[in-house]
């Protein structure tokens, strides 16, 4: 079976911290002094202007705080007694209020795109953002196809799209220690300025009549029969027909829904943006240069990615990340960051004392098999990372949500216009997607299991074989996969190619994955085939019939057709 890796999309939400500096001082970083180094960077930043979503905090203390959350997550020290009830359902009708919004979007950093799309269609929309509604300094890396989704839904013009691109580069490398090296073009090859992008969308949102409430967090949501009432932490009350939760993995509503659940998978990532790279015209989508590594009392496989940064021709962002389960003896972010200082220079072919550290980045991304998250309450829907729509390999953020903006904006308009805002109808907007669910086996194959002791080179060999076969099969197989799209025919071709060319490697794969995960993957793979047939053979004949149905039935069938399309990967258009 084919066990693959998708490049981590470099636009994480909520659990990321970055530290900024505009100092010209060169830092010689060692693991013993990283506390002092990071605090110097914060001090040099002069004021630490925070941005919503990724990059909200900025100190060594923030790293320790995030590590404490990671410790609690893998130790399961939380209890049901300590659960904070943010969202509650009330049976009685609310009192009439003067102003009722069609939608209140909680979490503006990524929520502003959907909010703007709805406002442009005539909906009365408000955005609630705990901090200031502005983008971070660090670029988001996406493909042009993904970015054009914002033009498709009217959020950006063609000219504005070009203006928000901070840097463009080609080609990109995929490579594994001692094995295959593949070069591709036009995949995650744009660095988009979140500052410009969010400022542009915010201006268009306000121009369409939208309301922005900054510096206010969500304290409570009470759902009544005819509306939802949002209480903000400054005492402000908003009444809305629909609440969109775009607050990412750290959403308090998501924490309530998933309370007591241990994540099925976690990605830990550390990195920097630094100045001083002479050869800086290409990127790495995913790269390894070491076998399985002992980190503390646990073993893990380190992966790398790197991109030119838009802040200068010699500026480069490098990330080191790993996939883990959430068991107690897994390494901390601080341990990984110490390894990063040692491993990044030979990876990039530089000396640490020759580069200027501009930003330090680190993040924690938990994912769950029960995703996308179905609506748990009437009038509340999780969107983006909050819903778990991201792949457990690519880990979401900006590029993950753009793929679904067209589907979500049209679906939400249908729901609002037909007043289909109960949890059963809203759940149709976060449907089962077999191509997403099947990726869990890939995540397992790329992480070192505690109860299995594979060869230190197993993961590198596995990925090398997969990409070697994909390269031979050509663009129709490798390009969709590298853009976070799983399709049945390319996957079937790859499976056959591996079985024919590397039959002796199959038993090792089965040992690494395990019988039950393999059985689970088989179920999703069969569903992927079924969804492909339904979309290609059945859906075209249903389109005119669906349009003849009453609005309520149209809503249900449109969501079903979208589930077949997106669940089979046929939303991908090259």
Q: Which residue ranges define each predicted feature?
A:
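C-terminal helical "tail/cap" subdomain of flavin- and related membrane-associated enzymes
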Residues: 47, 56, 60, 72-75, ...
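FAD/FMN-dependent oxidoreductases across multiple families
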Residues: 310-312, 325-444
């Amino acid at each position: 079976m084919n066990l693959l890796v998708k490049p981590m999309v470099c636009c994480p939400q909520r659990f990321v911290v970055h530290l900024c500096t505009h100092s010209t001082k060169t830092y010689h970083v060692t693991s013993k002094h990283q506390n002092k180094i990071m605090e110097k960077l914060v001090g040099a930043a002069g004021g630490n202007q925070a941005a919503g979503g990724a990059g909200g905090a900025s100190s060594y203390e923030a790293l320790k705080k995030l590590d404490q959350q990671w410790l609690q997550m893998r130790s399961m020290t939380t209890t049901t007694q300590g659960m904070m009830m943010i969202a509650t359902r009330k049976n009685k009708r609310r009192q009439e209020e003067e102003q009722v919004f069609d939608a209140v979007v909680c979490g503006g950093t990524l929520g502003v795109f959907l909010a703007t799309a709805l406002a442009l269609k005539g909906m009365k929309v408000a955005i609630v953002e705990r901090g200031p509604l502005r983008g971070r300094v660090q670029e988001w890396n996406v493909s042009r196809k993904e970015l054009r989704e914002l033009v498709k839904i009217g959020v950006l013009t063609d000219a504005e799209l070009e203006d928000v691109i901070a840097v463009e580069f080609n080609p990109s490398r995929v490579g594994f220690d001692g094995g295959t090296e593949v070069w591709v073009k036009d995949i995650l090859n744009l660095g988009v300025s979140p500052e410009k992008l969010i400022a542009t969308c915010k201006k268009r949102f306000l121009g369409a009549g939208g309301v922005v409430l900054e510096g206010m967090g969500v304290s409570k949501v009470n759902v009544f029969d005819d509306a939802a009432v949002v209480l903000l932490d400054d005492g402000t009350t908003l009444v809305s027909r629909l609440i969109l939760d775009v607050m990412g993995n750290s959403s308090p509503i998501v924490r309530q829904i998933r309370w007591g659940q241990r994540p099925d998978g976690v990605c830990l990532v550390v990195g920097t943006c630094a100045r001083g790279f002479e050869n800086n015209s290409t990127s790495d989508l995913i790269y390894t240069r070491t076998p399985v590594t002992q980190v503390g009392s646990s073993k893990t496989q380190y992966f790398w990615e790197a991109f030119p940064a838009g802040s200068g021709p010699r500026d480069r962002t490098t990330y080191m990340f790993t996939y883990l389960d959430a068991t107690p003896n897994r390494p901390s972010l601080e341990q990984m960051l110490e390894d990063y200082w040692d491993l990044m220079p030979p990876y990039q072919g530089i000396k640490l004392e020759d580069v200027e550290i501009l930003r330090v980045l680190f993040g924690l991304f938990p994912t769950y098999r029960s995703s996308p998250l179905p609506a748990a309450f009437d009038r509340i829907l999780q969107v983006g990372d909050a819903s778990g729509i991201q792949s457990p390999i690519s880990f979401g953020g900006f590029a993950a949500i753009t793929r679904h903006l067209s589907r979500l904006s049209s679906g939400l308009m249908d729901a609002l216009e037909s007043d289909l805002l109960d949890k059963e109808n809203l759940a149709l907007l976060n449907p089962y997607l077999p191509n997403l669910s099947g990726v869990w086996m890939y995540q397992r194959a790329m992480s070192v299991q505690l109860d299995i002791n594979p060869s230190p080179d197993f993961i590198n060999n596995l990925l090398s074989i997969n990409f070697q076969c994909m390269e031979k099969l050509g663009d129709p197989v490798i390009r969709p996969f590298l853009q976070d799209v799983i399709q049945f025919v390319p996957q079937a071709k790859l499976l056959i190619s591996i079985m024919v060319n590397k039959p002796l490697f199959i038993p090792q794969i089965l040992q690494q994955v395990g019988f039950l995960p393999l059985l689970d993957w088989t179920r999703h793979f069969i569903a992927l085939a079924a969804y492909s047939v339904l979309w290609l053979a059945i859906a075209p004949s249903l389109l005119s019939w669906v349009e003849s149905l009453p609005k309520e039935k149209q809503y249900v069938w449109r969501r079903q057709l979208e589930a077949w399309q997106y669940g089979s990967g046929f939303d991908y258009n090259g």
